Amino acid sequence: MQVPGTMPAPVLKGQALWLPLLLMLSPQASGGLVITPPGPELVLNISSTFVLTCSGPAPVVWERLSQEPLQKMARTQDGTFSSTLTLTNVTGLDTGEYFCTYKGSHGLEPDGRKRLYIFVPDPTMGFLPVDPEELFIFLTEITEITIPCRVTDPRLVVTLHEKKVDIPLPIPYDHQRGFSGTFEDKTYVCKTTIGDKEVDSEAYYVYSLQVSSINVSVNAVQTVVRQGENITIMCIVTGNEVVNFEWTYPRMESGRLVEPVTDFLFNVPSHIRSILHIPSAELGDSGTYICNVSESVNDHRDEKSINVTVVESGYVRLLGELDAVQFAELHRSRALQVVFEAYPPPTVVWFKDNRTLGDSSAGEIALSTRNVSETRYVSELTLVRVKVAEAGYYTMRAFHEDAEAQLSFQLQVNVPVRVLELSESHPASGEQTVRCRGRGMPQPHLTWSTCSDLKRCPRELPPTPLGNSSEEESQLETNVTYWPEDQEFEVVSTLRLRRVDQPLSVRCTLHNLLGHDMQEVTVVPHSLPFKVVVISAILALVVLTIISLIILIMLWQKKPRYEIRWKVIESVSSDGHEYIYVDPMQLPYDSTWELPRDQLVLGRTLGSGAFGQVVEATAHGLSHSQATMKVAVKMLKSTARSSEKQALMSELKIMSHLGPHLNVVNLLGACTKGGPIYIITEYCRYGDLVDYLHRNKHTFLQLCSDKRRPPSAELYSNALPAGLPLPSHVSLPGESDGGYMDMSKDESVDYVPMLDMKGGVKYADIESSSYMAPYDNYVPTAPERTCRATLINESPVLSYTDLVGFSYQVANGMEFLASKNCVHRDLAARNVLICEGKLVKICDFGLARDIMRDSNYISKGSTFLPLKWMAPESIFNSLYTTLSDVWSFGILLWEIFTLGGTPYPELPMNEQFYNAIKRGYRMAQPAHASDEIYEIMQKCWEEKFEIRPPFSQLVLLLERLLGEGYKKKYQQVDEEFLRSDHPAVLRSQARLPGFPGLRSPLDTSSVLYTAVQPNEGDNDYIIPLPDPKPEVADGPLESSPSLASSTLNEVNTSSTISCDSPLEPQEEPEPEPEPQPEPQVVPEPPLDSSCPGPRAEAEDSFL
């Protein structure tokens, strides 16, 4: 098809042969190709339309990216051919090379191709996109490559960086091609700044391919020099030691000969350098300097060139202009950049209102000038959190001895509008006036609007604008004032309403470029009916009542409820992350635990909490060997709710289910009929472990101090060490002085009557317990004396062995609970009680603790949790297992070896505590703990609970740290306890037929279901119990001293051992004083206040 007005195009077969002939015969061939508008570069505005025309003596065509875009070809009357390319709605992607060539020539002829480069600055596109394969650049040692990070705006300053390195590389940059040079095997990123935003290019990866060739690099000390300065160019060759240098430079043909200097770089192998030095350069020395290197062995050649410019004098040239007015938003940071070229390096000074600016000490103004290339500089003014006072006239001046340049602009600080005042008044004229005043920059616009049929203007409904109202209804007056000292405009507008018949909402709205602000006021008639006032008052009272009820309901829901912390596991999922707990209310209750209320005489309150209290009492008939026994009774307060009564009954059933153990506060009996529920447990006269450690800390520290003396001075039996005075009772501020536990007393009643008792009520003043006095002065009464063969030593001195012994006993008790699949959930030193002879027992006295005032418990919803003692899985996933108790045991160890310290003393109980636990933070080694003890703590604090040691393993680990005497004494006391007529042992025997065949507490196998026949209608209940195993997995039976802790294989009533409930009194003569034993010679311990390491020969306490 032939285009009208054009000649038929030659056929493609002979087109390449006819084209030179046409060029020679054409009368305009000498003119060649002509591009309109001429190049070589054009900068187009984004979204504009542009027309390119190419003409020549033969058919021409436009090409881009090896393709021919859509274009229009024509032939004029004088025989000239032309092609028109229309670029419509240009974007940054239109940036690139455009070629005009003769159709079918493919650029074969020298004059048959002409190039034009077009830039389309696009603020959203810093760098032109590249194909993925262009991101990987392969080179040889002699190959110069180009990193093609091309920009859409030639005015942008582009720097090349190694990835994650802020220092730019001194590589020449071409806006049309990118960075060209020799690169190392690294990852490179191009950077530029568009406005206030720094833009990074894609990462380019350079890989070198090793070839046996020479590699040449050329660099100059300066590529720009002034006339009369020296030119020094270095040509460096790597990879070969026998090369020939040939230089080509501008004035070589005119007869100026320069002898280069060649030397070896001895500190770098295979590096040869040739230096071309031209002193006193002249203008004619400007041009290209070429270093040609050759070697004759493999006939390898390589050459590199560099351009050097000689200027007559120095210069300073600004690149690009800033708008005359620059804007900054109030309290936002603003950076202003000026780009310029200069040689030699200039001095840069910034001025504000003709006053020199310096770096502000407060960091509010930052000035910096950086050299991005040899002669290009960027000077930046940064205003941090712009203030109104920083508006003004700014000037940047760059100068040196030869030239100077400066750029000035005005900075305007835009301030968001704000309505400062909206008020109404009632002038004497009868009108109602509304006045609105506001400020902002740039000048705000004020509009008035009303909602005539509503009391206020809803945001979703457009109000009625004022301004078109008639003169009879309203009158508007607006004044605008500029305040130079505040650099902002103030608008004051007055609206006069001539008649208001009903309440009317009037809105004043201010807006400018940064947003808008509004306020509303309700205009009421002069004579507002009394009915409206009454209705408003009633509505306000109703709203206040509803709000008060909501607050009361929320407070009632947040009130903590008592719940038993101990849980019995019924089954475990296959992955070990889901546990099903036994419902305690479904456990049977054996009536053999019942004790008639008339056999119990209540005394004073030992501890009182938010839900209940613990009372000292005397029980009659609990033991065959003792007519009376001092006990502790747990009960609820009279204000207890039904759910709390149910929780106390659950605690009773769990305690009766567990059975007796030496290191657990054992159940002795209960009163559940004919009155409130009483749980009767063992009485521990020395209170909780925290308070015990605080009271006896001075004896421990004194003992450690004495151990630094020669061993001959250290005699420790049942008496105090030499030089240590008898400890007098010292009451520390905020601590109890040997009390049952550290609890607040919220009642002033010292003696608790038996409530709701059938028959006669007994009130008795129980003999004042000596636990309130220093226990070293305590002398047991005749009924309380115990057989010395089974009593534990009652030395008042606290030793390192005692600390390890406490830990060992708690581990034994927790091993027993774990064998019963019981999870404690609140294991802490405050829930460990101290009995005669430093025997410890695990308990849970949350009932009698005011947890709402106890700083150890943190409110979480409607409950209080001991977060500092809880394992991570319990805090974050509410997962409680025996292994989460292991974590708490590690915290308890830290308490013991800090002598009663509070865990995590350096962490506040807020988000910082939770974050520290998630990051794996653990407490440091206590001062009094040995490395072995701290290693046990760290094992207990493993992040994954599956790899924490079980309590059976913890017993073995702690057992190794104790002397043989201690372990034998403990085993003897445990066996005596199990052979005694202790009420807990006797009732467990009566409750379980076939008593000698009870399971070992070390049996931690999976849960089976064994039928138990209770006395009162519970025959259908199946209670979960561990199944028996013939042997223990951890080793021979006799290897664990805790084996006998709950084994009831020998039954007799020869003696009774209970916590503070001694045996039947026996008549025995007063012991004669024994001669003082000879002191043993022991190595002197290290001078460490912690007294680490148990020393059996120096410790005769406990056990």
Curated annotation (Swiss-Prot):
Residues annotated as glycosylated: N45, N89, N215, N230, N292, N307, N354, N371, N468, N479
Regions of this protein lying in the Extracellular compartment: 33-532
Keywords: ATP-binding, Cell membrane, Chemotaxis, Cytoplasmic vesicle, Developmental protein, Disulfide bond, Glycoprotein, Immunoglobulin domain, Kinase, Lysosome, Membrane, Nucleotide-binding, Phosphoprotein, Receptor, Repeat, Signal, Transferase, Transmembrane, Transmembrane helix, Tyrosine-protein kinase, Ubl conjugation
Region: Disordered, residue numbers: 1017-1103
Top EC class for this record: transferase
Membrane topology, from the record: Single-pass type I membrane protein
Signal peptide segment: 1-31
Biased composition annotated in UniProt, kind: Acidic residues: 1065-1075
Cytoplasmic-side positions: 554-1103
Domain Ig-like C2-type: 33-120, 129-210, 214-309, 331-403, 416-524
GO molecular function, one term: platelet-derived growth factor beta-receptor activity
Transmembrane segments: 533-553
Ranges of biased composition (kind: Pro residues): 1076-1086
Sequence positions that bind ATP: L606, G607, S608, G609, A610, F611, G612, Q613, V614, K634
Modified how: N-glycosylated.
Residue list for modification Phosphotyrosine: 562, 579, 581, 686, 716, 740, 751, 763, 771, 775, 778, 857, 934, 970, 1009, 1021
Gene Ontology biological process terms, A to Z: angiogenesis; cell chemotaxis; cell migration involved in coronary angiogenesis; cell migration involved in vasculogenesis; cell surface receptor protein tyrosine kinase signaling pathway; platelet-derived growth factor receptor signaling pathway; positive regulation of calcium-mediated signaling; positive regulation of cell migration
Activity control: Present in an inactive conformation in the absence of bound ligand. Binding of PDGFB and/or PDGFD leads to dimerization and activation by autophosphorylation on tyrosine residues.
Entry keyword annotation includes Repeat: yes
EC number of this enzyme: 2.7.10.1
InterPro entries in the record: Ig-like_dom (IPR007110), Ig-like_dom_sf (IPR036179), Ig-like_fold (IPR013783), Ig_I-set (IPR013098), Ig_sub (IPR003599), Ig_sub2 (IPR003598), Immunoglobulin_dom (IPR013151), Kinase-like_dom_sf (IPR011009)
Reaction equations catalysed: L-tyrosyl-[protein] + ATP = O-phospho-L-tyrosyl-[protein] + ADP + H(+)
Subunit structure of this chain's protein: Interacts with homodimeric PDGFB and PDGFD, and with heterodimers formed by PDGFA and PDGFB. May also interact with homodimeric PDGFC. Monomer in the absence of bound ligand. Interaction with homodimeric PDGFB, heterodimers formed by PDGFA and PDGFB or homodimeric PDGFD, leads to receptor dimerization, where both PDGFRA homodimers and heterodimers with PDGFRB are observed. Interacts with SH2B2/APS. Interacts directly (tyrosine phosphorylated) with SHB. Interacts (tyrosine phosphorylated) with PIK3R1 and RASA1. Interacts (tyrosine phosphorylated) with CBL.
Function: Tyrosine-protein kinase that acts as a cell-surface receptor for homodimeric PDGFB and PDGFD and for heterodimers formed by PDGFA and PDGFB, and plays an essential role in the regulation of embryonic development, cell proliferation, survival, differentiation, chemotaxis and migration. Plays an essential role in blood vessel development by promoting proliferation, migration and recruitment of pericytes and smooth muscle cells to endothelial cells. Plays a role in the migration of vascular smooth muscle cells and the formation of neointima at vascular injury sites.
Family of the protein in this entry: Belongs to the protein kinase superfamily. Tyr protein kinase family. CSF-1/PDGF receptor subfamily.
Protein name: Platelet-derived growth factor receptor beta
Organism in which the protein naturally occurs: Canis lupus familiaris
Gene symbol of the encoding locus: PDGFRB
